[in-house]
Amino acid sequence: MPKYELQETLASGSTSKVKRAAAPGNAKCVVKVIRKKDVPLRVFLREVKIHRSLRHPNIVGFVDSYEDCHGYCIVMKLGCGEVGSMIRAGGGLDPLLAHFYFRQLVSAVEYLHGKCICHRDIKPENMLIDSAGNLLLSDFGFSTVFFHKGRRRRLRSPAGSLEYMAPEVFEGAYDGELADVWSCGVSLVVFLTGALPWDRAVESDERFSAFVSSRGGCQVPLSSIGDQAMGLVMRMTAKEDRRPSVSTVMKDPWVMQPNELLDESGLCRDSCRLFSLVPRQTGSALHFTQPGEVHKTPRTRPVSSQPRRAGSGDICRVYIGEESLRLALRRVCEALDGMVVSHRIAKEHVMFSTVDSRRSVLSGEVGVIRLDEGCCMTIRRAKGDPQEFKRFTRVLAESLGCNGRKCTILYNEI
């Protein structure tokens, strides 16, 4: 039996689960359990080899790996949240915080590239934070080496998340380092604006096509970015042969400007000041009027190699007053009916699927458990944007009558 006591599931995907765990001495960690039938041993060993070799203050710490009857397991240090969940939809991060996290992101990626490793799935959802608020880059399931037998090699397998993938990745032959730079550039746009500039960097995408035509960032959300930062975004999203290395990005005047949150080592100087810049989440009225099919299988697409971590953008817990489980489930269904959200009951869960304000699929489940002083509803995001999920949960909570003193809404931290 492994020395780790597996606890609640924080996230699950098609090939693996991430579970909270306790190590000897009651140290907190997470264990990614990969089903053997779904992932070849060589892929697991590659991820372990890469992650084990990394030592950087802005990269989530590798702890251990093992194999048991349940699957291949990777043990990592426990994060305290997710950068993606701190980003306000349509508003982004506070400018000081956006610069702080971008500096730390580029530092981590520069370290990776210095070891001839490219990440291939850089996005805010793969950026955790530690207890001091520092960024921790995570998810190395798609990572690979780009220097082999003394020669730089071009990569050919598409990997990553569509919105953050460089155009050449869709074409089938690309430089892994420069593809990471592109993903960092798109992440910077999200940091600054709270919105994605396009759905995918291909000619058929109207917003991307407009960006390529203008090269001036005249469309939303790019139009809201300052000139100096926008100049950097444009350089990072230039054609592959004109795109700078991450080391060059690190020397950019916008990146190098002083930041009161950073100490001499590039870590957070004042955690209280940092967390004061994170806006408290408030409810936002949304209309979910065009439900999708409940749990319809999405079209095949490159996605994150690991299940999405259940950070504060993935799980919402709603604590309500005295009620039976049956009544609580009925109230959930009635609330979803009122929101015109497609749903179905599966045992003690309600599965739901709808479209958000960006016309993208948002789906998940609502579970109910009985507590000593009432019921707890756990709303879990399966697919969709973290910020849209937060808005959805606020509207659902209000529909459940949870805007009074009897209800408490908490977003999970991992």
Curated annotation (Swiss-Prot):
Gene Ontology BP annotations: intracellular signal transduction
Enzyme class: transferase
PANTHER family xref list: KP78A-RELATED, MAP/MICROTUBULE AFFINITY-REGULATING KINASE
Reactions catalysed, as given in the entry: L-seryl-[protein] + ATP = O-phospho-L-seryl-[protein] + ADP + H(+); L-threonyl-[protein] + ATP = O-phospho-L-threonyl-[protein] + ADP + H(+)
Ranges where the Protein kinase domain occurs: 4-255
SUPFAM superfamilies documented for this protein: Protein kinase-like (PK-like) (SSF56112)
Protein name: Probable serine/threonine-protein kinase CHK1 homolog
EC numbers for this chain: 2.7.11.1
Keyword vocabulary terms for this entry: ATP-binding, Kinase, Nucleotide-binding, Nucleus, Serine/threonine-protein kinase, Transferase
Catalytic residues as annotated in Swiss-Prot or TrEMBL: D121 (proton acceptor)
Main function: Serine/threonine-protein kinase which is required for checkpoint-mediated cell cycle arrest and activation of DNA repair in response to the presence of DNA damage or unreplicated DNA. May also negatively regulate cell cycle progression during unperturbed cell cycles.
Gene Ontology CC entries for this record: cytoplasm; nucleus
Family to which this protein belongs: Belongs to the protein kinase superfamily. CAMK Ser/Thr protein kinase family. NIM1 subfamily.
One Pfam family here: Pkinase
Subcellular location: Nucleus
Region (Disordered): 291-310
Record-listed ATP binding positions: L10, A11, S12, G13, S14, T15, S16, K17, V18, K32
InterPro entries in UniProt: Kinase-like_dom_sf, Prot_kinase_dom, Ser/Thr_kinase_AS
Protein source organism: Encephalitozoon cuniculi (strain GB-M1)
GO molecular function: ATP binding; protein serine kinase activity; protein serine/threonine kinase activity
